[in-house]
Amino acid sequence: RSAILTGQPIWRLEEAGNLWSTLPKKFITYPEVLNKAGYLVGFTGKGWSPGRLSAGGRESNPAGKEFKDKKLKPSFKAMRNIDYAANFDDFLGQVKKDQPFCFWLGTSEPHRGYELGAGKRTGKDPSKVLVPGIFPDNSIVRNDILDYYVEVEHFDKMVARAIRSLEKIGQLENTIVVVTSDHGMPFPRAKASLYDAGTRVPLAIRWPQGIRKSGRVSHALVNLSDLAPTFLEAAGISVPKMTNGKGHK
């Protein structure tokens, strides 16, 4: 998340290259730049985390102002009670007329701690699971993947609600929507590994007014540290000199 926010690889970010650390204030983040340019910036759920920002000289989360008041009753035990989409609505309610905005919707789901058997209880069929070749193919693995899918669906529903909110206020066609992840699925040889399942994360971008030849599927190698300069270039804002990610406007 530090790399996404700063547009820099983790080996340049000192303490921020480690988990449960801090993000030194000297490293500029794209929400900070957008905020100075007049954007309303905010986040819900996971912004920059986990760690102690005060140790790096920061007083607030570099992802923006936190929106966290809206709660829900989770469908399953392991899910958090944050209503991410409703918090996004609260954020939109603070956007002034003609003010540009940037929001980070950071769900914790999918995350380990799945409720055992959640997949089967929602009617999913273990026999239809495509088991990656790096895992043993047995009932334990198949059902574990189904439980993972339940949390993926929870994420999907939150994104769908957020998109509908943009549509309601007439800003969907004028908004860059990026859906991605900070790491691979939380399974062996995936999250925290350099295997494909650990580094090959989803990335979908929608911007009808700005993307040429939309509807494409690309297999190009992309680094998520390139998102920060891409956002700033798309907004017509100068990219900080310390940023060494490359924009893909």
Locate predicted features.
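Formylglycine-dependent sulfatase
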Residues: 1-249
